[in-house]
Regions:
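N-terminal membrane-anchoring/stem segments of glycan-assembly enzymes
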Residues: 1-68, 377, 404
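Cell-envelope/extracellular polymer assembly enzymes that use nucleotide-activated donors
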Residues: 75-78, 107
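Acidic donor-binding segment of Leloir-type glycosyltransferases
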Residues: 95-142
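Long helical/loop segments within the catalytic core of UDP-sugar-dependent glycosyltransferases
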Residues: 137-147, 151, 155, 181-252, ...
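Short aromatic/hydrophobic "clamp" motif used to bind/position activated sugar donors
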Residues: 164
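Acidic donor-binding/catalytic loop of UDP-sugar-dependent glycosyltransferases
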Residues: 168-184
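Catalytic donor/gating beta->alpha subdomain of glycosyltransferases that bind UDP-sugars
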Residues: 192-217, 246, 252-317, 423
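Membrane-embedded multi-pass helical conduit in multi-pass membrane proteins
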Residues: 324-415
């Protein structure tokens, strides 16, 4: 009886399934595929802007002898590194940041969160080697502020530079020109800068997924940025004007959370018209891939931060959640249509030419769904110097919504722990 109903109403069923598949492809194009080339465009724009800024500074320096009061040089920069127990990683990072080929003045401020003995000894040794290195620490007193928030805040307050760049201890600059290229984008019309950071590939499935997540997050933020919206910030490789940080109250809005300080600050206070995105490899940081538990904790933290957003930022992330389901829904609808058509022809023993137009449309939808996800991100992945995921992108897209549900469940289960609490010094 069910089969008789399907065959008698197949025109309506087929039309509905193909229209539903087309709707999913349209959503994918509008909310994802159309913006996957933005990163490549931003790399080109950044390189052009850096070239102009370099030429401008060279002209200023060349005419400095004739015009004494002509502004010249690059801004003073303080690189703040919040560190807890990462002594080995910090030992690898410090020579990279202390030996930057920067034409201006800069310093490195290490904010010691936990006052670990190994970290303290390491900082003492490096302080004797380089006059650029300064240290500060979180005082051993009762406090209700998460350690990283307090460490970054103390580092910013201790900074003597006009600009502060926050980087993690497990990251490494792309080259000795990293700071110079970064500084060329710290212009007077900007208060907040987000640089690109991604994990070093290790060949594992979790690493490949984590790298793809950060690329997709960057693309989402660039799409929102094109419409005047700032969607959060990564944990590392962001720069802020020190006076701006003080004027907006720093991390005041995220004090009740044990994470999300830079994310919430960027969403609430960063003006898109005074914010810049740096995507070029020259200003990139490469981060050591953390453990799976750390990656999961970061995903849960980001999910909780997104839940607390409002206004346009909330709608953008809701759109991301909707489009995440489109590949699965498309696969379901087009597979159902194909299965029904095969079953109908198998029962009759001949191909029904009356459905040729429908079959051509279904085949076209399959081609679009299979090849467009492979082709669209090629330019951006090449510009970001990331390896193209290849066929893995199909698996990633199909698993993404289910992983989002899993992270949301973890977030709900752990939400009672997302409160400001007393932090003993033994942490």
């Amino acid at each position: 009886m069910i089969w008789d109903f399907v065959t008698s109403h197949f025109y309506i069923i087929a039309t509905s399934l193909l229209c539903f598949s087309a709707w999913q492809l349209l959503l994918l194009y509008l909310l994802r595929w159309r913006g996957e080339g933005l990163a490549a465009k931003y790399v080109v724009w950044q390189n052009e802007a850096q070239a102009v800024e370099t030429a401008t500074h060279e002209a200023r320096c060349a005419s400095a002898d004739e015009v004494a009061d002509l502004p010249q040089g690059y801004p003073k920069i303080s690189i703040v590194v919040p560190v807890s127990r990462e002594a080995m990683e910090l030992d690898e990072l410090l020579p990279c940041v202390l030996e930057q080929d920067y034409a201006g003045w800069y310093e490195v401020v290490v904010a010691n969160q936990g006052q670990e003995e190994q970290v303290s000894l390491l900082l003492e040794r490096w302080t004797q080697r380089s006059a650029r290195l300064r240290t500060t620490f979180v005082p051993a007193t009762s406090r209700y502020i998460e350690l990283r928030k307090l460490a970054i805040t103390l580092g910013v307050k201790a900074a003597r530079g006009e600009w502060v760049i926050v980087i993690g201890p497990t990251t490494v600059p792309s080259s000795s020109r990293w700071l110079q290229c970064y500084a060329e984008n710290l212009t007077p019309d900007v208060d907040f800068v987000e640089g690109y950071v991604n994990y070093a590939p290790d060949g594992s499935g979790s690493g490949r997924r984590a790298i793809m997540e950060r690329v997709r997050t960057l693309q989402s933020r660039l799409r929102a940025y094109e419409h005047g919206v700032v969607l959060g910030c990564e944990l590392s490789n962001f720069a802020l004007r020190r006076s701006w940080f003080m004027s907006v109250g720093g991390f005041a809005e995220s004090l009740e959370l044990p994470f999300g300080e830079e994310y919430i600050m960027a969403c609430l206070h960063a003006d898109a018209y005074r914010t810049a995105f740096l995507c070029a490899p020259d200003t990139r940081l490469t981060e050591i891939l953390p453990s799976r538990s750390t990656l999961t904790a970061r995903r849960v933290a980001e999910a909780e931060c997104r839940r607390r957003l409002h206004g346009k930022q909330k709608w953008y992330w809701l759109a991301e959640a909707v489009v995440a389901w489109c590949p699965c829904l498309f696969l379901l609808s087009n597979t159902v249509y194909s299965a029904l058509r095969i079953a109908m022809d198998c029962r009759t023993g001949v191909y029904a030419a009356d459905w040729l137009a429908f079959d051509v449309v279904a085949g076209l939808w399959w081609l679009v769904a299979l090849f467009v996800p492979l082709l669209m991100p090629r330019r951006s992945m090449k510009a970001l110097q990331e390896r193209h995921p290849g066929l893995y992108i199909w698996l990633y897209d199909l698993m993404l919504p289910w992983r989002m549900v899993y992270i949301d469940l973890l977030c709900r289960m752990q939400r009672r722990h997302f409160v400001r609490r007393y932090i003993p010094m033994t942490c």
